[in-house]
Amino acid sequence: LSADSSILLDVRDLSVRFRTRDGIVRAVSELSFTLRRGETLGVVGESGSGKSVTSLAIMGLLNRATADIEGEILFEGTDLLRLNKNELRQVRGRDVSMIFQDPFACLHPMYRVGKQIAEAVRAHSNVSRSAAWDRAVELLGAVGIPNAKVRARDYPHQYSGGMRQRAMIAMALVHNPDVLIADEPTTALDVTVQAQITELIDRVKREFDIGVILITHDLGVVAETATHVMVMYGGRAMEYGPANEIFNGAQHPYAWGLLESMPTIEKRLDVLVPIEGSPPSLLHPPSGCPFHPRCKYRFEPCDSRVPPLVEIPGGHRDACLLPPERKREVWANRISRELGVAT
């Protein structure tokens, strides 16, 4: 058991490899992070960075016939990777729950929404069907579905995209989990509904006193709700620390690139600055730092050494070989450009 009793989830050196006809896909490599009660960990990165694979590994939803998983995933001291199927089923959905990307694909089109939530209630509770139905209606109301008693009898196609996502959040909360994983919960929703869903997840965290892992490519969502941020690239953590430190003092060139490509009201740039190039192949990853082929600050060691995630002051960690003084210089120049100040 971790010495820090406030830690709900402690992921240590997690690596996930998929065996394919073409070779080994290194989806996640040596990933470590913690989640405490009351925290929201925002996991950001481009598609293929390993964000969703990490969440599926935590939930025990990867097929062990094709996936090799190493490391530890400790939930309140218990390694989830060492549990058998029955033991894991007792944890999944009850202690650790997940909101998936596409609510329409996750809800069965032939069953009423309330019935599907009620089934989730009965999966871990010895309650009657009527009691489970009442709980489903209660949860639908709690997540903002109007006239929940009536709408519980609707089918998924009768719900809007935002309402379907609210129903998925209700389903994830049926057993008051300690950890809630939200995998791209605002994908394909309009901006107004995105804000409502993000606000709902944040309210749920406060009211239920849980830990949330928010997986997204939207830095704006992370800036609004996350207490901590982990930046992933090529299956590895590039930077990890308190959200205010990441947004106000990022140390990794990839994090700089993500921030420069994010539009904000404060920026005085005429155009956003894209990150040149494409994410690496996880089947044939580059040697050394996975970001070095796209990094404009790379120097000699970057193509041969994999930088470790090392701690710097303030509980902040980054995986970059660039000297600290050079990082400070780059960050100062970036701020000056945004403010329109000559350097």
Where in the sequence are the language-model features?
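P-loop NTP-binding/switch modules centered on Walker-like glycine-rich loops
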Residues: 46, 60, 181, 185, ...
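Short catalytic/signature loops enriched in Gly
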Residues: 5-7, 146-150, 240-343
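A short, proline-enriched helix->beta-strand linker immediately N-terminal to the Walker B motif
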Residues: 174-178
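Conserved ABC ATPase signature
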Residues: 154-159, 163
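Conserved ABC transporter NBD signature motif
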Residues: 67-79
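ABC-type ATPase nucleotide-binding domains, specifically the catalytic core motifs of the NBD
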Residues: 18-22, 60-65, 82-88, 111-131, ...
